[in-house]
């Protein structure tokens, strides 16, 4: 009579079942994207560039054009992370929470005349720079496209203010939360330091639909913070790309927009009941 040792088979089966249930739990529990870029490299494979954005030989992400160390007029550029982010789930109704941090420098030849700032933003994966989006529009909007069709949420770091020309714009440099247009829904004054390294953190708390932006200059430990209620599910498509945009303006109103480092993490918690009803699925973005 043939005999066999069943212990290895039992161990193998137990290992398989453990792996299966871990995988099943992971699919049901969250959909996550996380990355950290401590130093940019030319021709960065993980980034998509639009306009005049580029990476310098020293590993700095330059969002607008710089020639011989000098910022140039009427320049606009974007840099986005190549992999799309699933910001909400059409099947379960769940919305992602995210947090991003980055260090940056804005430097102007004349600190009394600056233009125009930079922004972190979320937009449809195929979003492109609109025409006429230099200067105050930060490469995101123009004078005729401030409506819900944009599907853009941004946090602007605005260095230019011209309240006499644009009554909606605060009469101070500011951090603003933008929804589908350049007129911010909430702002806080920002005491910009010319050439200073700033550390910014932007967080979205999905359970209470709150977008929070804060900025600190390590050199003086002054913190600026603003928050607003934003329903990403009502504004953005299911999949987005995240990144930066910046623009300069008139010949004398220029500055550099340099990003030194960047990290991002998003987690989309699944609705287990809905996932069970609709069978387990692994999400993939298709263009």
From Swiss-Prot:
Gene3D superfamilies registered for this protein in UniProt: 2.60.120.200
Pfam families: Lectin_legB
Positions with a binding annotation for Ca(2+): 158, 160, 166, 169
Residues of the propeptide: 279-287
Binding site for Mn(2+): 156, 158, 169, 174
Residues annotated as signal peptide: 1-29
Cross-referenced PROSITE patterns: LECTIN_LEGUME_ALPHA, LECTIN_LEGUME_BETA
Keyword Protein biosynthesis: no
Keywords: Calcium, Disulfide bond, Glycoprotein, Lectin, Manganese, Metal-binding, Signal
Keyword check for Manganese: yes
A molecular function (GO) term: metal ion binding
InterPro entries the record matches: ConA-like_dom_sf, L-lectin, Lectin_LegA_CS, Lectin_legB_Mn/Ca_BS, Legume_lectin_dom, Leguminous_Lectin
Binding-site residues, N-acetyl-alpha-neuraminyl-(2->3)-beta-D-galactosyl-(1->4)-beta-D-glucose: 74, 116, 133, 136, 160, 166, 253
Glycosylated residues (UniProt): 90, 142, 208, 220
Post-translational modification: The glycosylation on N-90 is determined to by of the high mannose type in PubMed:26003537, while PubMed:27720757 found a paucimannose at this position.
Family: Belongs to the leguminous lectin family.
Physiological role: Sialic acid-binding lectin recognizing oligosaccharides containing terminal sialic acid linked via alpha-2,3 bond to penultimate galactose residues. Binds the trisaccharide sequence Neu5Ac-alpha-2,3-Gal-beta-1,4-GlcNAc. Binds fetuin when fully glycosylated but not when the high mannose-type glycans are removed, although the secondary structure is virtually unaffected by deglycosylation of the high mannose-type glycans. The lectin activity may depend on the presence of a single GlcNAc attached to N-90.
Oligomeric form and interacting partners: Homodimer; disulfide-linked. Dimer of homodimers.
Name of the molecule in the record: Seed leukoagglutinin
High-level lineage: Eukaryota, Viridiplantae, Streptophyta, Embryophyta, Tracheophyta
Gene it is expressed from: MAL
